């Protein structure tokens, strides 16, 4: 039998995800590799999800736990909109997720989350959540997963407090690209999105390839 601590270690050691707070929105990025121990289990893993018109989230950890949580939160966001006529705010969504995670703290959902959103009143918001519901509201950037130490190195060097989404996209892609070169549990491409006053925009593989070419030209 696998103990809870051993299970936690097995499922929390892969992935790289990053989030950047920009002056006009939020940028989120993840790699696409899913691992089980030393096995690359999936080369097209989805780790970036649109939750609502103005909210998106990245996942790291146990895929099943994260997907179950995403289905629940997406449904709650739809119900909220039907009842009130308004979109759930990023803070409200984060608080709801935190309550669900904390309610399961004795049998925790083995996932670490980054939530980015745009509040039409209060602007861009970026949060990170731990497996038992702890919330951090980020004022600049954050990263999770086994490749996060490398990603943080790039983010620390490249991030500026007045960064725009256009620049933030390049910084996020560069951070992911660097992490994938150094971390065996991250790789197989990048998923990328931004959230601003116009909503969630998820980029195509072709658009991401264009960002990679811009970065490589500067090296």
From Swiss-Prot:
Keyword line: Autocatalytic cleavage, Cytoplasm, Hydrolase, Protease, Proteasome, Threonine protease, Zymogen
GO annotation, cellular component aspect: cytoplasm; proteasome core complex, beta-subunit complex
* Modes of activity regulation: The formation of the proteasomal ATPase PAN-20S proteasome complex, via the docking of the C-termini of PAN into the intersubunit pockets in the alpha-rings, triggers opening of the gate for substrate entry. Interconversion between the open-gate and close-gate conformations leads to a dynamic regulation of the 20S proteasome proteolysis activity.
Enzyme Commission no: 3.4.25.1
Q: Does the keyword Cytoplasm apply?
A: yes
- List the PROSITE patterns: PROTEASOME_BETA_1, PROTEASOME_BETA_2
What name is this protein filed under? Proteasome subunit beta
Organism of origin: Methanococcus maripaludis (strain C7 / ATCC BAA-1331)
Gene symbol of the encoding locus:
psmB
